[in-house]
Regions:
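Nucleotide-activated donor-binding/catalytic signature segment of Leloir-type glycosyltransferases, i.e.
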Residues: 252-273
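A conserved mid-protein helix/loop that constitutes part of the nucleotide-sugar donor-binding site
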Residues: 19, 209-235, 249-255
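Short hydrophobic beta-strand element within catalytic cores of glycosyltransferases
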Residues: 310-313
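Aromatic "clamp/platform" in nucleotide-sugar-dependent glycosyltransferases that forms part
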Residues: 293
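N-terminal subdomain of nucleotide-sugar transferases
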Residues: 1-45, 49-55, 375
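Short alpha-helical donor nucleotide-sugar binding micro-motif in glycosyltransferases
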Residues: 147, 272-273, 280-285
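Carbohydrate-associated surface elements
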Residues: 41, 159, 179
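Conserved acidic donor-binding segment of nucleotide-sugar-dependent glycosyltransferases
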Residues: 324-336, 345-350
Length: 387
């Protein structure tokens, strides 16, 4: 099949959507398909390796300045149209999503969409708390309108599918968890020398244990809650250092918060890191933590498990079938006290036992299974379109 993937975020950006698309591109290509990606060009980024990555001129998005807004022009339109895709698979509800729909219409391609992001959790960036409920209703209505115009909708989890059904989406839906390259995160691939080098880079002192968070530093990721409980965690485990890998609009606020709480000496912000070496940052950790409730799947949880870390996460339906409390990770309730107790457990003997077996529970989320399921989804959609 000839497949076009369209997205408003892609490599070298580090987030779940970009990782999912990169994994899908690589695995489908390995399986003999011709796969092209169309996405915004990141500032300062030049790609000389891959002629199936089509980077489009872009500018920083007005609201989310760490994201890019693409401007697909006539040349890009010609390039995409002449490829005559069997499948157009959009991964965005905005600029590149519309561009993908336009290309699909031009070539009469089958149109698939993956709903990666629960947009009602992101309205704060526009409203800043003013009339936010009205904005959330608009986000729900827009998602319904958008998804009902596709041949098939792919949902990373049952949580997402249930949410879209509640919105009123009646297009055929399939639940297909995004896959990841499990092998590259395997603990045995990272030796002590590499681990020590990364820990030194992040200011980790000898004898300190690393509490790790990787991803976009944004309000919806709820890193504030982790920072709030950090002073009390340090009373129990004074050897902990909180390392935050990534970049985003909340970094300055969290830096100030760490100072005000008196924990700045135990917190490191690394800034953004390339996807090719992100596994090395997982490898230097001891416990991975997330308090986000806005995930559709949460690939970082699986990456952390594949890296042999104990994951401590605020419970969310996106984790159904991924983390079982006390077995493959530690799940907590939403309140601060519950998160604190979960982190104390994670740094105890229980956490060490969970970490020792974590990689086994990440194994089913590999890229091959993901690509096979997507391949079957495409074939089914093509067959139905011919009826």
């Amino acid at each position: 099949m000839k497949i076009g993937l369209f997205s408003d975020t892609f490599y070298p950006e580090i987030n779940g959507v970009a990782t999912s698309i990169l994994s899908l591109h690589r695995e489908l290509t390995r399986r003999g398909h011709e796969v092209h990606v169309f996405a915004p060009k990141c500032r300062g980024w030049e790609d000389n390796q891959q002629d199936t990555f089509h980077y489009i001129t872009s500018a920083p998005f007005l609201v989310l300045k760490d994201r890019n807004f693409a401007f697909p022009g006539p040349i890009t339109n010609w390039e995409a149209t002449k490829l005559d895709f069997d499948i157009v698979h959009t991964n965005s509800e905005f600029v590149m999503g519309y561009f993908g729909k336009h290309i699909a219409k031009s070539n009469d391609s089958v149109l698939i969409h993956t709903y990666h992001t629960i947009w009602e959790e992101y309205t704060y960036y526009i409203t800043h708390g003013v009339a936010d409920e009205a904005a959330r209703k608009v986000a729900r209505k827009y998602s319904q309108w958008w998804c009902n115009r596709f041949d098939r909708i792919v949902c990373p989890t049952g949580k997402t599918a249930g949410l879209l059904y509640d919105y009123g989406v009646r297009a055929p839906m399939e639940i297909i968890p995004s896959g990841m390259d499990i092998a590259r995160f395997a603990p045995e691939r990272h030796d002590a020398l590499e681990r020590t080098a990364r820990r030194n880079e992040c200011g980790v002192q000898p004898g300190e244990r690393v509490l790790l968070n990787i991803g976009r530093i944004a309000k919806e990721k709820n890193i504030e809650q982790i920072m709030r409980v950090l002073p009390r965690l340090l009373q129990v485990h004074p050897d902990v250092r909180f390392v935050i890998v990534g970049e985003g609009p909340m970094r300055e606020h969290l830096t100030k918060m760490a100072r005000e709480l008196g924990v700045a000496d135990h917190v490191t912000f690394t800034g953004p890191k390339l996807w090719e070496i992100i596994d090395q940052y997982y490898a230097m950790g001891d416990v991975f933590v997330s308090a986000s409730r806005s995930e559709t799947q949460g690939l970082t949880y699986i990456e952390a498990m594949a890296s042999g870390l104990c994951v401590c996460a605020v419970n969310d339906s996106c984790l159904d079938g991924v983390i079982q409390d006390g077995v493959s990770g530690i799940l907590t309730d939403e309140d601060d006290e519950s998160l604190l107790q979960g982190l104390i457990r994670a740094f105890s003997e229980e956490g060490k036992h969970i970490a020792a077996h974590a990689a086994e529970y990440a194994a089913p989320f590999g890229t091959e299974a993901f690509a096979i399921k997507m391949e079957q989804c495409y074939e089914k959609a093509i067959a139905e379109a011919k009826k």
